[in-house]
């Protein structure tokens, strides 16, 4: 896993949810950090903007923690390179 992607997503989540960065771990569920459904939509939009990717709604619904977000981002970046 790319540490730069991790750091960027960790910052996005911490800023969007107003939580301390050290609470945003790979396995911490966004809901456990206080995210409701609107927060999750805003997180996905912020991630899309930060990485210049598109996350379809059906995929966005599957992203519940940092690890899943990073996995999706890495896959999307790899696809753009092809």
Curated annotation (Swiss-Prot):
O-(pantetheine 4'-phosphoryl)serine is found on 37
Q: Which GO terms describe its cellular component?
A: chloroplast; cytosol; membrane
Functional pathway: Lipid metabolism; fatty acid biosynthesis
Keyword flag Oxidoreductase:
no
Just give the chief location class. plastid
Matching InterPro entries? ACP, ACP-like_sf, PKS_PP-bd, PP-bd_ACP, Ppantetheine_attach_site
Q: How is it modified after translation?
A: 4'-phosphopantetheine is transferred from CoA to a specific serine of apo-ACP by AcpS. This modification is essential for activity because fatty acids are bound in thioester linkage to the sulfhydryl of the prosthetic group.
What biological-process terms (Gene Ontology) are attached? lipid A biosynthetic process
Q: Where is the Carrier domain?
A: 3-77
Q: Which UniProt keywords apply?
A: Chloroplast, Fatty acid biosynthesis, Fatty acid metabolism, Lipid biosynthesis, Lipid metabolism, Phosphopantetheine, Phosphoprotein, Plastid
Question: Which HAMAP family does this UniProt record tie to the protein?
Answer: Acyl_carrier
**Stated role:** Carrier of the growing fatty acid chain in fatty acid biosynthesis.
Q: Which family does it belong to?
A: Belongs to the acyl carrier protein (ACP) family.
Query: What protein name is recorded for this chain?
Result: Acyl carrier protein
Which species does the entry assign this protein to?
A: Gracilaria tenuistipitata var. liui (Red alga)
């Amino acid at each position: 896993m790319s540490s730069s992607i991790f750091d960027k997503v960790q910052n996005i989540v911490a800023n969007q949810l107003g939580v301390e960065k050290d609470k945003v771990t790979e396995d911490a569920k966004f809901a456990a950090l206080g995210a409701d459904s609107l927060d999750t939509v805003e997180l996905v939009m912020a991630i899309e903007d930060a990485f210049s990717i598109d996350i379809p709604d059906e995929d966005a619904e599957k992203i519940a923690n940092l690890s899943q977000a990073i996995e999706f981002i890495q896959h999307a970046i790899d696809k753009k390179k092809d």
